């Protein structure tokens, strides 16, 4: 997938970001390099390879000692949302900024 300069300008416009021609060209180059890297990674055959939580597991003889995934704080969402101008179903409501 390769982007064109018009794509970068359109994305910048939608995000309400002002970019110069030079910045747009530099961003285009960086994005296309990134997409090229992603395509290379997707081309690798990974069938039969077990996913890792972290690559350090491959070089350390001992697995990482991770803490239990447990709630350690009380749910204070209602307290935090009392001062919000608008909430709904536990979510903060904000004005629409992108059409």
Curated annotation (Swiss-Prot):
Please state what class of enzyme this protein is: ligase
What is catalysed by this protein?
L-glutamyl-tRNA(Gln) + L-glutamine + ATP + H2O = L-glutaminyl-tRNA(Gln) + L-glutamate + ADP + phosphate + H(+); L-aspartyl-tRNA(Asn) + L-glutamine + ATP + H2O = L-asparaginyl-tRNA(Asn) + L-glutamate + ADP + phosphate + 2 H(+)
Q: Tell me if Oxidoreductase is a UniProt keyword of this record.
A: no
What superkingdom does the record give? Bacteria
Q: Which UniProt keywords apply?
A: ATP-binding, Ligase, Nucleotide-binding, Protein biosynthesis
Which GO molecular function terms does the record list? asparaginyl-tRNA synthase (glutamine-hydrolyzing) activity; ATP binding; glutaminyl-tRNA synthase (glutamine-hydrolyzing) activity
Q: What Pfam families does UniProt report for this protein, alphabetically?
A: GatC (PF02686)
Asked whether the UniProt record includes Hydrolase among its keywords, one would answer no
The Gene Ontology biological process annotation of the record reads: glutaminyl-tRNAGln biosynthesis via transamidation; regulation of translational fidelity; translation
EC no.?
Answer: 6.3.5.-
Query: Which HAMAP family would you find in this protein's record?
Result: GatC (MF_00122)
Of which family is this protein a member? Answer: Belongs to the GatC family.
Subunit structure of this chain's protein: Heterotrimer of A, B and C subunits.
Q: What does this protein do?
A: Allows the formation of correctly charged Asn-tRNA(Asn) or Gln-tRNA(Gln) through the transamidation of misacylated Asp-tRNA(Asn) or Glu-tRNA(Gln) in organisms which lack either or both of asparaginyl-tRNA or glutaminyl-tRNA synthetases. The reaction takes place in the presence of glutamine and ATP through an activated phospho-Asp-tRNA(Asn) or phospho-Glu-tRNA(Gln).
Instruction: Output this protein's name.
Output: Aspartyl/glutamyl-tRNA(Asn/Gln) amidotransferase subunit C
Give the species this sequence originates from: Ralstonia pickettii (strain 12J)
Task: Supply the gene name.
Answer: gatC
